[in-house]
From Swiss-Prot:
Encoding gene (name): queF
Name of the protein: NADPH-dependent 7-cyano-7-deazaguanine reductase
Highest taxon of source: Bacteria
Assembly: Homodimer.
InterPro entries in UniProt: GTP-CH-I_C/QueF (IPR043133), NADPH_dep_7-cyano-7-deazaG_red (IPR050084), QueF (IPR029500), QueF_N (IPR029139), QueF_type2 (IPR016428)
UniProt-annotated location(s): Cytoplasm
GO BP annotations listed: queuosine biosynthetic process; tRNA modification
Pfam family, one: QueF
The enzyme's E.C. designation: 1.7.1.13
Pathway annotation: tRNA modification; tRNA-queuosine biosynthesis
GO CC term, one of those recorded: cytoplasm
Native source species: Polaromonas naphthalenivorans (strain CJ2)
Function: Catalyzes the NADPH-dependent reduction of 7-cyano-7-deazaguanine (preQ0) to 7-aminomethyl-7-deazaguanine (preQ1).
Catalytic residues as annotated in Swiss-Prot or TrEMBL: 188 (thioimide intermediate), 195 (proton donor)
């Protein structure tokens, strides 16, 4: 079984510039989910939205082509794709000739689907969209909608996940709120390098104490875990301690190595949000 410690993270890597799908390094989701109390059958739906800003290949005449790529990896896939391996894989397209962008898109979809669904009794596909240069000026930048928790002047002293900071009012009528923060920070599980993010929490149920929620978000500051795992941990802690009827947690992390990762988890089926980057991304 692939583990984070066996990946290329934190190691010197040769940059291959000829197409090589074997560079992708899938890591099973299950071990971390069991640690969080998720179990083999998650109670949430969702996906991991990736954006690749550094994708290039050669056309049949050897002329470089560029594009942005967006990926939707369903959270029911048994594996996440380790991000450095994703970067190395994308770099392997750099000096490889393809007849057109459609062939590149098809190759990306086939390879990433195989890695993400590897080991599943029934495999499916991931979503892949290429944005060519003539579409670049249509790309929007927008902030997360909702009431900002960052307006609160709270004292923060805990920098590892502290779910006991979460509380809700159970003896008052339920509410529906959308709360956001730009103060999410965690660290790479293997290298300890900082990962900076913003988070949007939408819920219906007992009103969540906002000061405690902000302190809880800040408590991830020194925590080592992958983006997807942090969002699932936030979801499970809120679900367990605050007992909402509906809950959605969506985080957008700043890019590293030309990639950003934006995990989305929700308690009820709904449309995946459009992959619109924020100013910090």
């Amino acid at each position: 079984m692939n583990t984070p410690e066996h990946s290329e993270l934190g190691k010197s890597s040769a940059y291959v510039d000829q197409y090589d799908a074997s560079l992708l390094f899938p890591i099973p989701r299950l071990a971390k989910r069991l640690e969080m109390g998720v179990g083999a059958t998650p109670i949430f739906f969702g996906a991991d939205l990736w954006t690749a800003f550094e994708l290039s290949w050669l056309n049949l005449r050897g002329k470089p082509q560029v594009a942005l790529a967006q990926f939707i990896v369903p959270c029911e896939t048994p594996n996440i794709i380790e991000s450095k391996s994703f970067k190395l894989y994308l770099n392997s397209f750099n000096n490889t000739r393809f007849p057109d962008a459609a062939e590149v898109q098809a190759r990306l979809r086939a390879d990433i689907s195989e890695a993400a669904w590897r080991g599943a009794p029934q495999a499916s596909t991931v979503g892949v969209k290429l944005l060519l240069p003539e579409m670049f000026d249509r790309e929007d930048v927008a902030e997360l909608d909702g009431l900002s928790l960052d307006r609160l002047d709270v004292e923060c002293s805990r920098y590892t996940p502290a779910p006991d900071l979460l509380s809700a009012v159970f003896d008052e009528p339920p509410v529906s709120e959308v709360l956001t923060s730009n103060l999410l920070k965690s660290n790479c599980l293997v290298t300890g390098q900082p990962d900076w993010g913003s988070v949007r929490i939408a819920y219906s149920g007992p009103q969540i104490n906002q000061e405690g929620l902000l302190q809880y978000i800040v408590s991830f500051r020194n925590h080592n875990e992958f983006h997807e795992q942090c969002v699932e941990r936030i979801f499970m802690d809120l679900w367990t301690r605050c007992k909402p009827v509906k809950l959605t947690v969506y985080a957008r992390y700043t890019r590293r190595g030309g990639l950003d990762i934006n995990p989305f988890r929700t308690s009820h089926p709904q449309a995946i949000p459009p992959n619109i980057r924020m100013a910090r991304q």
